[in-house]
């Protein structure tokens, strides 16, 4: 049984508490409980009427004369009543389903309560951050003394300025061609983008993930199963006059990959590493990161995705963020792990971690990775179940999890700020060099300012 319906029937207090912690009204839970009660009562009534109809059908065969005419008349009346009751049952079922689908995922008990992203809770710091001497006090206050750091006398040029000053990207011409938040990556940054992708895929393949290049477009039916589409529609691009939408992340087509399937227990978990471009309108981001390549309409990303048994999902949530940490430790970029609070969580996830990289030019941590356990929120909508074997009764809905591995343009911004030298060169993380060495024209040790190439 779907966890939200199970809670409605067996333990509604879980839903009440989840809604309260999210800062949302509990009225939707009351409505679901009432509709479910009415639906079950109507189902009982329909079954009783069907039973009576069957009894009368048998009685018609045995009755004779005037008695038979009376039985036929009653049978017709009951049949009409069955029809009306079935229509009412269908109406109640549709209304109940609509209400249930509007209830956000049940929040895990470890999610901190908070109103917005300012109340997300850092739970771990890694690496020694390079902190400009004027930013030290703010850094110590921000990290509450939990993070290591080294003081620097020179503040790096911010990534947004660096990519243009050193000729690594052309945003002005991209704006002329496609509008704001687009870019042309040039030469060394193109190679770096490729190397980051190969690094993440190579790592995940060694962890037994199946590498997937998914469709870059999805139908509305599939998209509605992976996200709250009415809220998400303003974020994605629609193909005009087609029932197709450009994907915002490979998570979405991979989540829908097993739509309307029953998976065997023995084949779970299914581990996928998706690689794709991502297309986002960035609605609601007006005024945020308007320069550079940090917040853009199109970017490349490697994504982790897991289908697993319900009892495995919390273990896998920790494993996915562990994979991410290994990748970012390999890059040598200081970061922190943040437990996302209730007000910033969104309705799909039961719990989410973010990995935020230290950006020395901005003197702040910035989001690079989101890692979510969606439990059975997506699988119920997509009708992805599990059973002991195919053909045997379903035991329930699988759990789905997703996590960024590396979003390449964001990773590039972190590399530029953390490994920038005074002469403008940027040291390439050692773990990426083996993916560049076989290519004669690719940079090997440093990204060079264009004038020095």
From Swiss-Prot:
Q: Where L-serine is bound, by residue? A: 249-251, 303, 404
**Binding locations of ATP:** 280-282, 296, 367-370
Assembly and partners?
Answer: Homodimer. The tRNA molecule binds across the dimer.
Any signal peptide, and if so, which residues? none
Task: List the protein's name.
Answer: Serine--tRNA ligase
Its UniProt pathway annotation is: Aminoacyl-tRNA biosynthesis; selenocysteinyl-tRNA(Sec) biosynthesis; L-seryl-tRNA(Sec) from L-serine and tRNA(Sec): step 1/1
Which GO biological-process labels does this protein carry? Answer: selenocysteine biosynthetic process; seryl-tRNA aminoacylation
